[in-house]
Amino acid sequence: MAKGKDVRIRVILECISCVRKGANEESTGISRYSTEKNRHNTPGQLEFKKFCRYCRKHTTHHEIKK
């Protein structure tokens, strides 16, 4: 049996374009995706290009802290 902390953790990815537009009130919302990452293989923050339904294009999504 494994002891200690779980290796796989759930993370939330957030669109950085929507966050920047939030200050200008142009965006209707903020796109967020939920996924898992392996803490040992990727100790840094995740960054993916995913589709944002509010921007209507593929944008960079960064991991946010809970």
Curated annotation (Swiss-Prot):
Gene3D superfamilies: Ribosomal protein L33 (2.20.28.120)
InterPro entries noted in UniProt: Ribosomal_bL33, Ribosomal_bL33_CS, Ribosomal_bL33_sf, Ribosomal_zn-bd
Recorded superkingdom: Eukaryota
Molecular function in Gene Ontology: structural constituent of ribosome
Regions crossing the membrane: none
Pfam families (alphabetical): Ribosomal_L33
PROSITE patterns found in the cross-reference section: RIBOSOMAL_L33
Gene Ontology CC entries for this record: chloroplast; ribonucleoprotein complex; ribosome
Compartments in which it is found: Plastid, Chloroplast
UniProt GO BP: translation
UniProt keyword annotations, A-Z: Chloroplast, Plastid, Ribonucleoprotein, Ribosomal protein
Similarity comment: family membership: Belongs to the bacterial ribosomal protein bL33 family.
Protein name: Large ribosomal subunit protein bL33c
This protein's encoding gene: rpl33
